[in-house]
Structure formats: C-alpha cells, structure tokens
Amino acid sequence: MAESFSFDVVSDFDRQELVNTLDQVKREISQRYDLKGTDTSVELDKENIFIITNSELTLNAVNDIIRQKAIKRNLSLKIFDYGETEMVSGNRIKQTILLKQGIKQEIAKKISKNIRDQIKKINVSINGETLRVASKSKNDLQLAIKLVSELEESLNIPLKANNFR
C-alpha cells in the first residue's frame, strides 16, 4: 500500500474541444439568418480567439454562440478573458478573447496557503503552473479537492484536480 497519496491542481482546457466549439460557431454563423451577410470571422491562434464583425450587436450574438457551444462541450467559461472591442479598417469591430491557461505564481501561492490553513496534515508544492497536493490520508485529499472547487469560484479561474494517486 502506498505511504502517500497525491493529486495535481491544474488550470487548462481540452484544446481539441475548443477547436470543435469554434467550428460549430463558424457553422452556425454561416447558417443563421440574422448573421448572414455580416462578414463575421472567428479565428483561433495559440493563446487568443479573434472575432471580427460589422456591428456591436453581431459581436454580442457571436459571443453568446461561443458561450452556448462551449458549455455544450464541457468547456469552462472561465477560460475566456474578453478583451476590449476596437475599430479596425472599414468600420469593422474586432474583439480579442484571451484563453486562460495555467496557474499564475501569485494565485498558486494563495491556493497553497488556503489549503494549508484549512487542512494541517497536507503538503502543497508549486511546480511551474501546477500544484501537487500530497497527504497520507485520502480523506484529507478529498477535503482538499472540495476546497479547490470552492476556491475556483472566488478566484475566477478554471481549476481541475487530476492525477489522483
């Protein structure tokens, strides 16, 4: 029997699910009557989604479609950080949506401190953009997982517990 049990706290998303979501969004934009002829484009690069369209109304409709499709594909809406809209050539509007991935150092420290304050017999180590939570008791780890899910709401970042060993 193992002497110590552990799990990792990560903040990431399934990139293929995001690609599939944006494919569905593009398909709906091309088929919806109110969005036809708006010359709307949705592009994905490594860290951002770019939406270029004709009007604020169309931009809001596209953002709603992205949210709906992301929820259906089990993507957390917390991965989207909506940027400001800006005017580009030809009276068009561009919005950049930053994709949140990884746990920043200061947030990792907050999570670590919070877990240690609540559960005494637990070890939390920060490994780059992940946290490793270890304990000799599975019950303590289950409490830590519950605590992480509660912290997810207050920190406004998507957190997952994985690699439970």
Swiss-Prot record:
Q: Which GO terms describe its molecular function?
A: nucleotide binding
Coiled-coil ranges from the UniProt annotation: none
Alphabetical UniProt keywords? Nucleotide-binding
Q: Identify one Pfam family in the record.
A: DUF520
Q: One GO CC annotation, please?
A: cytosol
The signal peptide here is none
Under the heading InterPro entries, the entry gives: DUF520, UPF0234-like_C, UPF0234_N, YajQ-like_sf
Superkingdom in the source lineage: Bacteria
Known role: Nucleotide-binding protein.
Q: Which PANTHER family match?
A: UPF0234 PROTEIN YAJQ
The entry assigns this protein to a family as follows: Belongs to the YajQ family.
Q: What is this protein called?
A: Nucleotide-binding protein A9601_05361
Q: What is the lineage of its organism?
A: Bacteria, Bacillati, Cyanobacteriota, Cyanophyceae, Synechococcales
